[in-house]
């Protein structure tokens, strides 16, 4: 549990773990052929993802699960002619707001029925985890249709009182914009938009909130 949310960095230096904002280096420096082999192995484990996406675009972002271990969010990219990756461990079990010290006032946002709720902060500050807690609170207490649009999917929600439809950009839909526009025709009560990424997506999200839906999303801030 202590490693959940921590990150492992693979590039042309020793394997580096980022835990509680501290960098811990392990082993000898990796050569470019070592990083390529490790990243190729990650794509083999992920199965549904192909390394050709990385080679074509120069970067890729996806998640996958290993039974009895956990889910992993992976960002692969090319830098200085070699391959690199950042891997984050995500627990199968959804986080407990009390264990994460999320204030009760924040959790009360799950009681809203319409409007736009933004969770802001820097990378790694817990935006996605906070949203997962809010979505799970609604899932456990209300009969709603919840649609999540994420890139990639992180926490997986099981149907409880609500029905939860989870869509991943690139594997389930072309883009946030396309998925968000389509979601308005899918009878949603609650929409989770992983990130306010561009003007048109923001505009559609605001329209959804103004027309009676409850929309959750994130913004990167310093």
Where are these regions (language model features)?
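Conserved glycine(s) of the Walker
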Residues: 126
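Amphipathic coiled-coil signal-relay and dimerization helices
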Residues: 14-21, 25-28
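Residue-level signature of catalytic and energy-coupling elements of molecular machines
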Residues: 7, 74, 109, 151, ...
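Short, small-residue-biased leader/transition segments that mark boundaries at the very start
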Residues: 2-10
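The conserved Walker
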Residues: 123
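Hydrophobic positions on the alpha1 helix immediately C-terminal to the Walker A/P-loop
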Residues: 130, 134
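P-loop NTP-binding catalytic core
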Residues: 24-30, 35-36, 40-118, 136-150, ...
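Switch/coupling sub-region of P-loop NTPases
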Residues: 143-145, 152-222
């Amino acid at each position: 549990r202590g490693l959940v949310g921590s990150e492992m960095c693979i590039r042309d230096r020793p394997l580096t773990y980022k835990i509680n904002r501290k960098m811990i280096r392990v082993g000898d420096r990796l050569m470019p052929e070592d990083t390529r082999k490790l990243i190729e192995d990650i794509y083999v484990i992920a199965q549904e993802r192909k390394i050709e996406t990385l080679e074509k675009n120069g970067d890729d972002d996806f998640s996958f699960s290993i039974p009895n271990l956990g889910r992993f969010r992976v960002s692969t990219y090319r830098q200085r002619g070699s391959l690199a990756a950042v891997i984050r461990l995500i627990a199968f079990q959804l986080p407990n707001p009390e264990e994460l010290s999320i204030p009760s006032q924040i959790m009360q946002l799950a009681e809203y029925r319409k409007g736009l709720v933004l969770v802001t902060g820097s990378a790694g500050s817990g935006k996605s985890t906070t949203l997962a807690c809010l979505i799970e609170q609604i899932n456990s207490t209300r009969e709603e249709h919840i649609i999540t649009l994420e890139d990639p999917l992180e926490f997986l929600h099981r149907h409880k009182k609500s029905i939860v439809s989870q869509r991943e950009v690139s594997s389930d839909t072309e883009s946030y914009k396309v998925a968000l526009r389509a979601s308005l025709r899918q009878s949603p009560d609650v929409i989770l938009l992983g990130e306010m990424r561009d003007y048109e997506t923001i505009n559609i999200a605001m329209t959804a909130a103004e027309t009676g839906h409850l929309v959750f999303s994130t913004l990167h801030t310093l």
